[in-house]
């Protein structure tokens, strides 16, 4: 398997990289991956992840709910209830930050299409992109959405979107600088980019350490703080307009983390 080796910090270009911790893939493989930090700017990333063309199998599990939409188990049931509330909250956030009740929106990494469907129902013209064929099929069958594969991003007309959203997507994308540049090109002159990412400087991340579910190796390649996500935006011509917490996302991640800690304890007992 071909793996991505990072020798220079994607944010500042620095070469002073240090291993920070080792995390486990609790979803698909049980494999371990190292997290590295840039000693110059503090940016954190996962080292040695499979390259983009080969990472697909790490998403192919029913436990990866944003692609499978499974409702089995208490954790997934909670996810579905929380999502219903968050869909409305996200829609209100889009309209507040864009100062628009309708417009043209691009949802990148749309998953099974719930958010794109919500915005469509509110009168927005929606384009949606998703790398998972399984998730694209679900969105088409359940919502009638024409969800394009990820490669279609480069086929979209520049300067035509009032809003672009990436809900927990940026941390998955291998070509980070290229993505930021493309986002800037696709937006209208006064367009708004909304990016939601886990905060690896949060209380929960500090508390749980290597068990924190939002490290989600190897699917999460990049691990942002409020400072580093803002620095990436500034690097590519974006100005930070607002910052919003997503407490229900954090709550769900903490529940997954507790489950992971239980799994690790059980595995250690079996090993003994």
Predicted feature residues:
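Short glycine/proline- and charge-enriched loop/turn segments
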Residues: 72-75, 208-217, 256-263
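Conserved SAM-binding loop
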Residues: 3-7, 17, 85-209, 221-236, ...
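Short low-complexity, flexible loop/linker segments enriched in glycine and/or proline
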Residues: 34-35, 63, 141-145, 163, ...
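Conserved SAM-binding loop and adjacent beta-strand
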Residues: 74-90
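Conserved small/polar residues in nucleotide/adenosyl-binding loops
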Residues: 270-272
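Short, structured secondary-structure boundary patches
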Residues: 39, 66-71, 147-152, 163-173, ...
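N-terminal juxtadomain amphipathic helix
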Residues: 1-73
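Conserved catalytic loop of SAM-dependent methyltransferase domains
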Residues: 24-29, 241-267
């Amino acid at each position: 398997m071909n793996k991505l080796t990072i020798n220079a910090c994607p944010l500042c270009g620095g070469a002073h990289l240090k291993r920070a911790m080792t995390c486990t893939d609790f979803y698909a493989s049980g494999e371990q991956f190292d997290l590295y930090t840039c000693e110059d700017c503090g940016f954190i990333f996962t080292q040695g992840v499979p390259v983009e063309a080969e990472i697909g199998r790490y998403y192919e599990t029913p436990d990866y709910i944003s692609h499978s939409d499974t409702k089995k188990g208490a954790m997934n049931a909670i996810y579905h209830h929380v999502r219903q509330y968050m869909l409305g909250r996200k829609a209100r956030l889009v309209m507040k930050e864009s100062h628009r009740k309708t417009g043209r929106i691009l949802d990148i990494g749309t998953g099974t299409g719930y958010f794109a469907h919500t915005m469509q129902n509110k009168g927005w013209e929606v384009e949606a992109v998703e790398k998972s064929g399984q998730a694209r099929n679900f969105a088409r069958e359940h919502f009638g959405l024409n969800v394009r594969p990820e490669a279609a991003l480069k086929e979209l007309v520049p300067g035509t979107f009032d809003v672009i959203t990436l809900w927990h997507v940026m941390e998955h994308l291998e070509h980070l600088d290229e993505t930021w540049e493309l986002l800037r090109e696709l937006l209208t002159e006064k367009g708004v980019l909304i990016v939601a990412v886990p905060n690896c400087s949060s209380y929960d991340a500090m508390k749980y350490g290597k068990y924190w579910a939002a490290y989600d190796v190897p699917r999460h390649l990049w691990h942002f703080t409020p400072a580093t996500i803002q620095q990436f935006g500034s690097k590519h011509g974006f100005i930070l307009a607002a910052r919003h917490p997503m407490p229900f996302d954090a709550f769900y991640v903490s529940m997954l983390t507790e489950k992971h800690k239980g799994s690790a304890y059980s595995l250690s007992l079996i090993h003994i």
